[in-house]
Every structure is written in C-alpha cells, then in structure tokens.
Design a protein with these regions (language model features):
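Alpha-helical scaffold domains
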Residues: 1-194
C-alpha cells in the first residue's frame, strides 16, 4: 500500500476482499492493527474495514472519536466513505439521529465526514424522497467555524441544486449574507443557480 500515492481504490478493493473472506472478529483485529500503522495508506485500508464493521457500536464510536483525529487528509476522505457505508448498510432514515449527532460533534473532521460522505445527498435513499431533510441538516453548518466544513457544505448544496434548483434557490434567498463564512458557502452553493 505504501507505494500508492494517488487515490484509494486499491485499499478499498483489498479491504472489501478481506472483509468478505474472513470472520468479523479477525477483520476487526486486522482493522485496528492496520489503523495503528505509521503509513497513511495502511490506515486508509483499516478505515475501509471499519466502515464494513461499523454496525458494531464500538467501531462507529472509534471512527467518530479517534479516526476523525487522524492528521492525514486522505484518511479523512476514507472516513467520509466509511460513514456513508454505515448509513447505507443500516438505512439512512434509521440513522438520522446518528447523522445529527455527528453533525453536531465538536471535531470538524467528524462533521465533514457526514457532509462529504453523504454527497450526493439526494442520490441516497430517504434523502432522494425527502430533499428538505438533507438541506435542513446541511445548512445548519453554513456558519461552521471550519473552512474545511463550510466548503463541503457549499459543495453539498451545489450538488443538490442540480436536481432541486428551486429548493436551494429558496433556501439561499433566506440567507443574510453578512459574514464572510456565509458568503463563502453561498458562493459555492449558488454556482449552478440562475
């Protein structure tokens, strides 16, 4: 893995293969062992495994509280994918309280794992039929102190505007563009709206 410098497909493919061909207890040990590596690519592999195991509460908690502290941005990208894996496997509507909990977390990487992981939100079951539920959750972070999170919020809203331009337009029309934070999100979110 350490020779892979771009992308994550190889780590994802290997993690899925190992998950499918071993019992969960072995995979859990493998995931923690990989995550303890000094090599970010190996940690990425471990986080993919965590995503497959995330119906276990201790794994989901570890993702939220520990993986979110990893200082490598690539590992954070995989955390977003792992969170989406959890939501997909459990059911998006069923995990709304957990989505909300992560969106309110003190760690910006945890909040971003949701906003980025569930992109394109309205392509996901439940949110496809309930786009306002996605919009409501995302816009709650429009003034987030983290620029990293705000960019993800703006991009997520822009994605939604492709399918639901009127909903996003109506939402943006209610914003008071008085801070640089809101203006940053507005600029990203309104990019495709006439």
């Amino acid at each position: 893995f350490s020779l892979i410098e771009n992308g994550f497909k190889e780590e994802e493919k290997r993690a899925l293969s190992d998950y499918r061909s071993n019992d969960k207890e072995f995979v859990k040990k493998l995931a923690f062992s990989a995550y303890n590596s000094n090599t970010y690519q190996v940690r990425m592999y471990g986080v993919f495994l965590f995503g497959y195991l995330s119906e276990q509460n201790d794994i989901l908690t570890f993702m939220r509280d520990e993986v979110s502290k990893d200082d490598n941005w690539r590992v954070q990208e995989v955390l977003a994918k792992a969170f989406d894996e959890f939501c997909k496997n459990t059911g998006y509507e069923k995990v709304l309280p957990i989505i909300d909990e992560w969106l309110e977390n003190d760690n910006p990487n945890t909040r971003r794992a949701v906003t980025e992981g569930l992109r394109i939100w309205t392509s996901r079951p439940y949110f496809k039929d309930n786009p306002n539920e996605a919009i409501r959750r995302i816009v709650a972070l429009k003034e987030d102190p983290s620029e990293y999170v705000r960019k993800s919020v703006g991009n997520a809203l822009r994605d939604i505007s492709k399918k639901f331009p009127e909903l996003i337009k109506d939402e943006l029309n209610n914003w008071k563009l008085e801070s640089k934070e809101i203006n940053q999100v507005y600029k990203l979110a309104s990019k495709l709206i006439n």
